[in-house]
Design a protein with these regions (language model features):
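Generic secondary-structure signature for well-ordered alpha-helical cores
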Residues: 26, 55-60, 81-85, 108-112, ...
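Conserved beta-strand elements of the Class I
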Residues: 34-35, 90-92, 135
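N-terminal small/polar loop signature for handling phosphorylated ligands or for N-terminal nucleophile
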Residues: 42-115, 230-232
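Conserved active-site and cofactor/substrate-binding residues in soluble primary-metabolism enzymes
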Residues: 16, 20, 45, 49, ...
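Single conserved hydrophobic/aromatic residue that forms the stacking wall/gate
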Residues: 233-243
Length: 243
């Protein structure tokens, strides 16, 4: 049986990585960003760390903030309409899983309008085209939505959630910058850190594991075990936050 691993086209890791967003946008001839970020991140100045980079580079953008903790069909529909109105040609997703999931759904529907019924994306939808290019900038360490092909949408009307799996929704660029996570409270740092550790353990123990995934998961377990508790004790220490 063949093993498959899917990765972003490009990823940046480390302090100051968000500065590369402008370089990538220019290199790819992107014209205008559709910035997806939740209201709290905007309120507390986290989103502005990225938009400041865009401003300094003279790059156009529009912010979409109708993001819920568990993104709904309506959030996605509103986002699709807002994206069309913005005349943007790429998405910058800033936040945790909610912003990432909303961005993926918006990007898929824009590129594959025959799936405008959000429910039609449930499961493994037979989309034909890659979604609108997404630059994913996580602000937590737990979901890893910036490097996965999955997203979850809430159907409020039917009181259920559904999972969508689509290789076409993989962000083209992931930007993992510890400065985007430095303002997380201790409780959220602990819970998302444990979430990341759980993913690493599950990835190592799953029957689908193989040599390359073992390499990633064992190293992740080592780093998280070494640094999570220390990052809570020394919350402002950049080295621990970076790990």
């Amino acid at each position: 049986m063949a093993n498959r691993i899917m990765l972003n086209e490009t990823s940046y890791h480390g302090a100051g990585a968000i500065k590369e967003i402008a370089n990538e946008a220019k290199a790819r001839a992107f014209k205008k960003a559709f910035v997806c970020s939740d209201p709290d991140l905007i309120k507390f100045g986290v989103t502005s760390k990225v938009t400041d980079v865009l401003d300094e580079a003279g790059l156009a953008y529009e912010i979409y903030s109708d993001i819920k903790a568990n993104p709904t069909i309506q959030n996605v529909q509103h986002g699709v309409e807002a994206f069309k109105a913005s005349k943007a040609d790429y998405i910058i997703a800033i936040g945790g899983g909610s912003s990432m999931d909303t961005s993926k759904a918006i990007g898929i529907i824009i590129a594959n309008p025959e799936f405008e019924d959000v429910r039609s994306l449930e499961g493994v939808a037979p989309t034909k085209k890659p979604c609108v290019p997404i630059i994913a900038v996580p602000t937590t360490a737990g979901t890893a939505a910036e490097v996965t092909i999955n997203y979850v949408i809430t159907d409020v009307e039917r009181k259920r959630k559904f999972v969508c799996v689509d290789p076409h929704d993989m962000p083209v660029i992931a930007v993992i910058d510890p400065e985007m996570m430095s303002s997380m409270p201790k409780g959220l740092t602990a819970s998302t850190g444990m979430d990341a550790l759980t993913h690493a353990i599950e990835g190592y123990t799953t029957k689908a594991a193989w040599e390359m995934t073992d390499m990633f998961h064992l190293k992740a377990i080592e780093i998280i075990s070494r640094s999570l508790r220390l990052s809570l004790i020394h919350i402002s220490e950049p080295t621990r936050q970076a790990e």
